[in-house]
């Protein structure tokens, strides 16, 4: 047995499923998950000594690559002053100044410890601010594991939501309406059925949890218009897309102004950080200035703030997003060329430093139904054959891939060459 296999066997006796987040268990592709020893730049190194070109990037945060010296040094310097104080620090102020400068729609920002905390808190704030209970989310989008968000669509287009996890009471789910991503008609229908009851829409501007599905041109502006028409707030969940699709996020890339924005992943530079913010009048409703309660023992943790501040300063440098786009475009085009040579039907979506690989005969993938029609079994084989080639992709057909500026064009070309060999055998 390999060292990863031995560790996984031991982990399953001590940790549910052997992992601390389900997708890491390789249940979407089968086999034994890799146990990682270290990472540097664009590469992961497992406990058995094998190196991999990494397109998971810790599920998004590693936009600069692993073990970036500016972030590492900031963490070391901050740790020497203490790990946590439970009191305000100067770095929290500097971090808030930087975030609100980089994302102009955020007049104010509150730091939390995860993307789930950010979305959960933003929804509570939207409900408190509007005095309404219902929310709209989209089929195939993921916003963390808060009870109100672990909800699937009912059997009819306008039925109330149903829990998609045991432990979520139906009374919670009934306030969540699930619409179809990239389908404005379904959203209007929900508003028309509940015109005075919907507090907010929450949406991934690029859906990154049904692989990578960008919005159609009219979708995000249409959501903004519907929120304005019916008096609801628009929450854009930029946990994945923030500082990655563009410096000011997908909202800037697509030209839409939200009322609230949720951030995570890159904002922490690899440390556990989330944030939410937006319009001043809405944010003023948060405790201690307003009645909507939100708190956290480790929110604004000095080590995490130092890591995030260093990361965002690097991400804001000229050329970063142009490099991400160039590398991702080259990878997408190369994979499509290699697949066509082998007669493999393939769609590759990409925006900025995000991409998604779909084995499908369809010309495009624009919604949850399109994603579910793809060949998952072929993806599983592709994943393991690429892993054997030293390329680490997301171990699920329903998760996006992530590029970093640490990837070289040689890494990209080597990945395309590996895919060409795999496609020939697939």
Curated annotation (Swiss-Prot):
It is an enzyme of class 5 (isomerase). InterPro entries: 4pyrrol_synth_GluAld_NH2Trfase, Aminotrans_3, Aminotrans_3_PPA_site, PyrdxlP-dep_Trfase, PyrdxlP-dep_Trfase_major, PyrdxlP-dep_Trfase_small. It is found in: Cytoplasm. It catalyses: (S)-4-amino-5-oxopentanoate = 5-aminolevulinate. One of its GO terms (biological process) is protoporphyrinogen IX biosynthetic process. Keywords: Cytoplasm, Isomerase, Porphyrin biosynthesis, Pyridoxal phosphate. GO terms for cellular component: cytoplasm. The modification N6-(pyridoxal phosphate)lysine is found at residue 265. Homodimer. NCBIfam families: hemL (TIGR00713), PRK00062.1 (NF000818). Belongs to the class-III pyridoxal-phosphate-dependent aminotransferase family. HemL subfamily. HAMAP family: HemL_aminotrans_3. This is Glutamate-1-semialdehyde 2,1-aminomutase. The lineage of its organism: Bacteria, Pseudomonadati, Pseudomonadota, Gammaproteobacteria, Enterobacterales.
């Amino acid at each position: 047995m390999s060292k990863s296999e031995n560790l996984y066997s031991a982990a399953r006796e001590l940790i549910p499923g052997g992992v601390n987040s389900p997708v890491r268990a390789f249940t979407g592709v089968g086999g034994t998950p890799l146990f990682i020893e270290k990472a540097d730049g664009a590469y992961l190194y497992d406990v058995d000594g094998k190196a991999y070109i990494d397109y998971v990037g810790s599920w998004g945060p590693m936009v600069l690559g692993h073990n970036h010296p500016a972030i590492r040094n900031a963490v070391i310097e901050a740790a020497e002053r203490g790990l946590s104080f439970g009191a305000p620090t100067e770095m929290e102020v500097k971090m808030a100044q930087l975030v609100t400068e980089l994302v102009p729609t955020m007049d104010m920002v509150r730091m939390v410890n995860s993307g789930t905390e950010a979305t959960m808190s933003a929804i509570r704030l939207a409900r408190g601010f509007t005095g309404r209970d219902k929310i709209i989310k989209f089929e195939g989008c993921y916003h963390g594991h808060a009870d109100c968000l672990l909800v699937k669509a009912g059997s009819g287009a306008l039925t109330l939501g149903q829990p998609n996890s045991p432990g979520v009471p139906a009374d919670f789910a009934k306030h969540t309406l699930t619409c179809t991503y990239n389908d404005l008609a379904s959203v209007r229908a929900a508003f028309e059925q509940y015109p005075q009851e919907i507090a907010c829409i929450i949406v991934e501007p690029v859906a990154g949890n049904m692989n990578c599905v960008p919005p159609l041109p009219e979708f995000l502006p249409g959501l903004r218009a519907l929120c304005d028409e019916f008096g609801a707030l628009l929450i854009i969940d930029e946990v994945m897309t923030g500082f990655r699709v563009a410096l000011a996020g997908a909202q800037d890339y697509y030209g839409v102004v939200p009322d609230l924005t949720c951030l995570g992943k890159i904002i922490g530079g690899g440390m556990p950080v989330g944030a939410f913010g937006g319009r001043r009048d809405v944010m003023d409703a948060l405790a201690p200035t307003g009645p909507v309660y939100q708190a956290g023992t480790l929110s604004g943790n000095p080590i995490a703030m130092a890591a995030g501040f260093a990361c965002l300063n690097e991400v804001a440098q000229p050329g970063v997003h142009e490099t991400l786009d160039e590398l991702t475009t080259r990878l997408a085009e190369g994979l499509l060329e290699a697949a066509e040579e082998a007669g493999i039907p393939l769609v590759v979506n990409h925006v900025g430093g995000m991409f998604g690989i779909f084995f499908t005969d369809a010309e495009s993938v624009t919604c949850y139904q399109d994603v579910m029609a793809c060949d998952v079994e072929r993806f599983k084989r592709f994943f393991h054959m690429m892993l054997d080639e030293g390329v680490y992709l997301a171990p699920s057909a329903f998760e996006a891939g992530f590029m970093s500026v640490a990837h070289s064009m040689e890494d990209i070309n080597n990945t395309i060459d590996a895919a060409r060999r795999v496609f020939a055998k697939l």
